[in-house]
């Protein structure tokens, strides 16, 4: 009996449920991925009218739903997209309920095969609950964002992880990650049985060990398929029911005690997948560390998002303190990336944030983890050890400004009278004693420099790096904080709000213009202002101010606050003030970016559908490489246009993703 079944049995008082074969595997015991071959199959017209995202109205109702369904459709096809759309719109459903909601247009077997593929790729979670008055169980399915994120970032994940290895290992690592992404999970034994590279097994096992130590691969457990809120509720009910009923404690104290115990057990269950001591062991035949061959491994999306956070902070530092300090800051982020805490406590996904005390406690705990966790602090010596050899930091600091005035020595040398012979030859001046002494000092110091050159260069490099770290720590934006003299850590809790604000301001400037940012900053600085105050501080025409405020209100960057002047709250005598609500503004911007990103995926799909025949012809084996000979000029022009539009869509998608992820994850 596993832990989850034990929890359910203790809560419900029922026997532990058996695993539903339709939840994970098909009838023959093998994982079914046949949904990927059904991309172009369509459902009935009534279902398509209900769930399709082809109309503008349906696409704008729920931006995240539009994005998730488009991502699923591009990878798994129309049927998988339809099922995910239902789960997002209606919440948890059983197979029978999905069958009824689709108006019986898909068979139950087809729905189960679709759910198997979605579950395998971590796009769906499930939970088994006992039926009332029966020993049978219902399996409820939920949509899971983690699988959608893995599909959306699949190319970037492969590129980011493989770039951390040497050139010889990059193709092998890229193949490992690609196989895990395409299958959802993979064990070491399964990969070694089908490996295409002719390398020793212990070297391949060493790559898996490195990926696990970096945090990119974690053990797949049953809790990865269990909804977080339901797991928390089961743990809480279990701890509450175990408290003695005849206790004299109040119900509030009992609930608090049960909550604290459930938190501890919840964290232990969530951290079990990242515990390397239970995943890596010594191989008795080679005495080398290896991953447990039967352990099922999957991609840790949170670890990858840490690297995306580091990239965003590096670009932000480059715009604030310059490229050299930003490069050293990038090394500091890379050094502490694996040990740094995640973006938020996983308990925030359980609904506990409805309590203000819980929110404050989580925020304080995150700030404490950023400073006190092992491996998150560093010094200049730590940075020097990982500085690339081809990266030069000498002469990267200017300690004092050069004066525009000429020195007295320069004036004297310029005013000295030069002697010439009859032929016009200039007689050089005689060397002074100072020149002789300087040359002698240089000659004497050459030997000492040869002996102590390495130590002096290291000392100078440490001093320069430490100066750059102090620049980052003393910046108005808190890129670093100093816990002890010359010991630093990265305060993510204070830094991420600054990053969000900077990117939001950049979007406002690029879309609505600089006057919009000026007025928004005026409102944000004064918190709650009237139009009269804005007219006096924004230094703009009154007509332009009203037009700009209207645009800001339209994009939810500024809100209107009604302040009544009378007791009866008469609208005719009320005053309307303006304010900025950052949480509302950021959420609106996130929805806007998500819709634009999904719309690009939708346009790409439409382009491929419109040119389906041409693309099939160009992708034939007998046509590849001979397009100019076998295709008509009009077909070549059309194919060129399709490639250019797809390339443009990919470029815009990556740019939108870099903006959207700041408001979605950070």
UniProtKB/Swiss-Prot annotation:
Residues 593-614 are annotated as: Leucine-zipper. GO terms for molecular function: DNA-directed RNA polymerase activity; single-stranded DNA binding. One of its GO terms (biological process) is termination of RNA polymerase III transcription. One of its GO terms (cellular component) is RNA polymerase III complex. It is found in: Nucleus. Keywords: DNA-directed RNA polymerase, Nucleus, Transcription, Zinc. The keyword Nucleus applies. It comes from the Eukaryota. InterPro entries: POLR3C_WHD, RNA_pol_III_RPC82-rel_HTH, RNA_pol_III_Rpc82_C, RPC3, WH-like_DNA-bd_sf. The keyword Zinc applies. DNA-dependent RNA polymerase catalyzes the transcription of DNA into RNA using the four ribonucleoside triphosphates as substrates. Specific core component of RNA polymerase III which synthesizes small RNAs, such as 5S rRNA and tRNAs. Component of the RNA polymerase III (Pol III) complex consisting of 17 subunits. Belongs to the RNA polymerase beta chain family. This is DNA-directed RNA polymerase III subunit RPC3.
